[in-house]
Amino acid sequence: MKRQRCKVFLVSLLLLAMLFGCAAPAAAPEAATPEAELPEATASLTAEPTDAVTQPDPLGTAVREDSDAVNAAYAKQYFDIVFSETVTQQEFVTALERVQHVQSTVTLAAADAAAALQGHSAVSLAVAGAGLAELAAVYTQEKIDATLQGLEVEGTVAADFACALDTGLVNRERAQVLAKNEAVDAALATRLLMAVATHNGTARNMMGYTDDPETYARIMNMWNTIMAANDPASLCEDETLVNVGVQILMEGVATGFNIVDISRDGRFLPELTINYFHDDIRHLRQVIGLLNSEGIVCKVQINPEFSVYQYLPEWDDDEPTPTYKVVQMAEDFYVVNTIGYFMELEFANAEDRLAFDALIKEVAKKNSGEEGKALLHNSWWQPTYESYVEVDDTYYEVYDQTISHGTYLMRIGTLDDILTPLQELAGEDCTVAQGKYWINDAYWRYMNGEDQ
C-alpha cells in the first residue's frame, strides 16, 4: 500500500528545522472533546471581562474563583452535569458521586431525595463528598466558634460549616448565604460541586496560576526530575506504543511522533485554552512572566513529551545529552529521542485568550531584519500553539491523529488524513482516533514548509 508522507509538527526537530533558519516545536496531547453541548451560560464566557474573583483568606494568600459561567461550562464538559434551577438533594448527591475519585470509599445519602437542596444540607453533603466528614466530627465547640465568628449556625451542621471554611470549600461570604438555610440555586450548587471536585483531584490538574510565584518552582521541580533521569525515553515506559511509532516512521507514514502521559493532562476548559509548545523550560517560564506582566492571569499546566523522529547519519550529531539521544532501531535506521514541553494555558476569558497571539508575535517571535530586537529567551522563528476549538480566522484547521495504549497517548498532527494507515499499523492493542484542532499562523506556515 502506498504510504503517504506527512508533515508532522515536532518540538524535537530542532536540528532539521535549523537548516531552514527556524526551530521546530512539538505536538500536544489530546484535550477533552470540545464537541459536547455546553450550557447557555457558556455564551457569557466571551462577554465577561474576567472570570477570576480574588478574595483574601486568613493566610493572606489569593483564593481565585471562576465565574458561574465557567463553572457551569466545566461541570457540563467534564462531568456532564447541568443542575435544575431548583436543585434537589438527590441531584446534588448524584453530582457529587460523579466527582469522586475512582477509588473513593465515600458514601452519600440524602435524607429527602426529592426535597429542594438547602444551605445546611448542601454544606454537609459537600464536606462528606470531599472526604472531610471525619475531620468535621473532631471539631470542638471552641474551634467551631472561633472559625464561624458569628455565623448563625447551630447543631451538628456547625462543625461542617467550620470545616468547609477551614478547608476552602466555601468562603465566608458564601457561608453566610448558605447559613440562612434557603434553597440553593444552580449556580451555587455548581460552585460547591467544583470545590469538591478540586479537593478530590478530579477537576483541573495544574501547576498553578501565572501570578503565583510558586508556579515557577513547581515547573523547575518537574524539570529537575526529568533532567536527573538523563534519558528522554524515561518519559515513556510503554514499549508497545513506542514500537508502533517507530514502525510508522519506518513505513514512511509520518516523519515523527510525540508521546505524553495522559495523567498529566490539565483538564482545562477547551474554549478558554491555548496549548503552547517549546523545548526550553526557561522560555516557558518567561512566557508565564510575560502574561503576568500584562495583567493576564490564567491557569498553567506543563506537560513534558517524548518526541521521536528519524535521524540521518549525514547530520553527524549523535552526541547524547539529557534531552537528546540517537538510537539505532534497525539496520540503517536510526531515530532521535528528544524531550519537549507543551504548556496548557486556560485564560480567564475569551478576550485574554485572543490577546495571547499578539503578545507572542511581539516579544517571542524572530523576524528577518529584526535581529537586534529584544525577545524572550530562545524565541523561535515560528512560535507555535493550538486550540481544540475555533479561535478566529488567524488559526487554521488540521488533522489530529492519536494512538493510545495504557496511560500513554501518541499524537501526530498532519495536513492530510492518515487515519487508515495508522489503524493498520497500530494493531488491536492500541486505540486510534482522529480529530481536528486549530493552529496559529506560524505553526501553519511551518507545516506547509515555510521557514518564517
Residue ranges of model-derived segments:
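Feature responds to low-complexity, polar/acidic, surface-exposed segments characteristic
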Residues: 24, 28-90, 98-118, 127-157, ...
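Eukaryote-specific, cytoplasm-facing alpha-helical/coiled-coil scaffolding segments in long proteins
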Residues: 190, 216-221, 312-318
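Long, low-hydrophobicity ectodomains and other hydrophilic envelope-associated domains
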Residues: 239-432, 436-440, 448-452
